[in-house]
Amino acid sequence: MAHPSQLGFQDAASPVMEELLHFHDHALMIVLLISTLVLYIIVAMVSTKLTNKYILDSQEIEIVWTVLPAVILILIALPSLRILYLMDEINDPHLTIKAMGHQWYWSYEYTDYEDLGFDSYMVPTQDLTPGQFRLLETDHRMVVPVESPIRVLVSAEDVLHSWAVPSLGVKMDASPGRLNQTAFIASRPGVFYGQCSEICGANHSFMPIVVEAVPLEHFEKWSTMMLEDA
């Protein structure tokens, strides 16, 4: 969950998000090392009084500044490609949910059940109860079981939207007439908030996403209750 004055990412709630956090630290460390080296060279060149006007070329230096950047790029690219493959890999999902973007709300359909679906609207500020978050709460949450592979099919009915939940490391564009898919595994119980991440009109900022991860037995009770109320 995000908090005021936060500088870093939200706490990871899925294996993919944990990998993204590790990659961020890895890339940031490389950037800091390069920046420190460049700053040191600039300061040394400006502050020194020594000059050498006879060195016009140096094959050794040219080899170093060609090979070293290539090695650095490889060190960044390899873990990045690994995470890209992990994000695209969807093996034997236990549950498939279709998320449809509308102006300006989300609708969810649990395709493994015959008649389990609902619309999810933002709770107005005047209807919030103590402990709820402004512009982030919905009247119906997308409930999923913990530690189960979940596939989310994302589309839109009218304009471009984007289904994103930072804690779970998922963000997928919702395009009219196109069915995109993403997947995640909630590694711990909790309530995870997201928002539409594509400008979609006047009420774009009023399209929150709430994913609630619960133990399997609680999910079964919830799905049974929803089917009975349908």
UniProtKB/Swiss-Prot annotation:
<feature type="binding site">
    <location>
        <position position="204"/>
    </location>
    <ligand>
        <name>Cu cation A2</name>
    </ligand>
</feature>
<keyword id="KW-0999">Mitochondrion inner membrane</keyword>
<dbReference type="GO" id="GO:0005507">
    <property type="term" value="F:copper ion binding"/>
</dbReference>
<keyword id="KW-0460">Magnesium</keyword>
<dbReference type="InterPro" id="IPR011759">
    <property type="entry name" value="Cyt_c_oxidase_su2_TM_dom"/>
</dbReference>
<feature type="binding site">
    <location>
        <position position="200"/>
    </location>
    <ligand>
        <name>Cu cation A2</name>
    </ligand>
</feature>
<feature type="binding site">
    <location>
        <position position="207"/>
    </location>
    <ligand>
        <name>Cu cation A1</name>
    </ligand>
</feature>
<keyword id="KW-0186">Copper</keyword>
<dbReference type="InterPro" id="IPR014222">
    <property type="entry name" value="Cyt_c_oxidase_su2"/>
</dbReference>
<keyword id="KW-0472">Membrane</keyword>
<comment type="subunit">
    <text>Component of the cytochrome c oxidase (complex IV, CIV), a multisubunit enzyme composed of 14 subunits. The complex is composed of a catalytic core of 3 subunits MT-CO1, MT-CO2 and MT-CO3, encoded in the mitochondrial DNA, and 11 supernumerary subunits COX4I, COX5A, COX5B, COX6A, COX6B, COX6C, COX7A, COX7B, COX7C, COX8 and NDUFA4, which are encoded in the nuclear genome.</text>
</comment>
<keyword id="KW-0479">Metal-binding</keyword>
<dbReference type="InterPro" id="IPR002429">
    <property type="entry name" value="CcO_II-like_C"/>
</dbReference>
<keyword id="KW-0812">Transmembrane</keyword>
<feature type="topological domain" description="Mitochondrial intermembrane">
    <location>
        <begin position="88"/>
        <end position="230"/>
    </location>
</feature>
<dbReference type="InterPro" id="IPR045187">
    <property type="entry name" value="CcO_II"/>
</dbReference>
<feature type="binding site">
    <location>
        <position position="198"/>
    </location>
    <ligand>
        <name>Cu cation A2</name>
    </ligand>
</feature>
<dbReference type="InterPro" id="IPR036257">
    <property type="entry name" value="Cyt_c_oxidase_su2_TM_sf"/>
</dbReference>
<dbReference type="GO" id="GO:0042773">
    <property type="term" value="P:ATP synthesis coupled electron transport"/>
</dbReference>
<keyword id="KW-0813">Transport</keyword>
<dbReference type="InterPro" id="IPR034210">
    <property type="entry name" value="CcO_II_C"/>
</dbReference>
<dbReference type="GO" id="GO:0005743">
    <property type="term" value="C:mitochondrial inner membrane"/>
</dbReference>
<keyword id="KW-0679">Respiratory chain</keyword>
<keyword id="KW-1133">Transmembrane helix</keyword>
<feature type="binding site">
    <location>
        <position position="200"/>
    </location>
    <ligand>
        <name>Cu cation A1</name>
    </ligand>
</feature>
<keyword id="KW-0249">Electron transport</keyword>
<feature type="binding site">
    <location>
        <position position="161"/>
    </location>
    <ligand>
        <name>Cu cation A1</name>
    </ligand>
</feature>
<feature type="binding site">
    <location>
        <position position="196"/>
    </location>
    <ligand>
        <name>Cu cation A1</name>
    </ligand>
</feature>
<comment type="similarity">
    <text>Belongs to the cytochrome c oxidase subunit 2 family.</text>
</comment>
<comment type="function">
    <text>Component of the cytochrome c oxidase, the last enzyme in the mitochondrial electron transport chain which drives oxidative phosphorylation. The respiratory chain contains 3 multisubunit complexes succinate dehydrogenase (complex II, CII), ubiquinol-cytochrome c oxidoreductase (cytochrome b-c1 complex, complex III, CIII) and cytochrome c oxidase (complex IV, CIV), that cooperate to transfer electrons derived from NADH and succinate to molecular oxygen, creating an electrochemical gradient over the inner membrane that drives transmembrane transport and the ATP synthase.</text>
</comment>
<dbReference type="Pfam" id="PF02790">
    <property type="entry name" value="COX2_TM"/>
</dbReference>
<dbReference type="InterPro" id="IPR008972">
    <property type="entry name" value="Cupredoxin"/>
</dbReference>
<feature type="binding site">
    <location>
        <position position="196"/>
    </location>
    <ligand>
        <name>Cu cation A2</name>
    </ligand>
</feature>
<feature type="topological domain" description="Mitochondrial matrix">
    <location>
        <begin position="46"/>
        <end position="59"/>
    </location>
</feature>
<feature type="topological domain" description="Mitochondrial intermembrane">
    <location>
        <begin position="1"/>
        <end position="14"/>
    </location>
</feature>
<keyword id="KW-1278">Translocase</keyword>
<feature type="transmembrane region" description="Helical; Name=I">
    <location>
        <begin position="15"/>
        <end position="45"/>
    </location>
</feature>
<keyword id="KW-0496">Mitochondrion</keyword>
<dbReference type="GO" id="GO:0004129">
    <property type="term" value="F:cytochrome-c oxidase activity"/>
</dbReference>
<dbReference type="Pfam" id="PF00116">
    <property type="entry name" value="COX2"/>
</dbReference>
<feature type="transmembrane region" description="Helical; Name=II">
    <location>
        <begin position="60"/>
        <end position="87"/>
    </location>
</feature>
<protein>
    <recommendedName>
        <fullName>Cytochrome c oxidase subunit 2</fullName>
        <ecNumber>7.1.1.9</ecNumber>
    </recommendedName>
</protein>
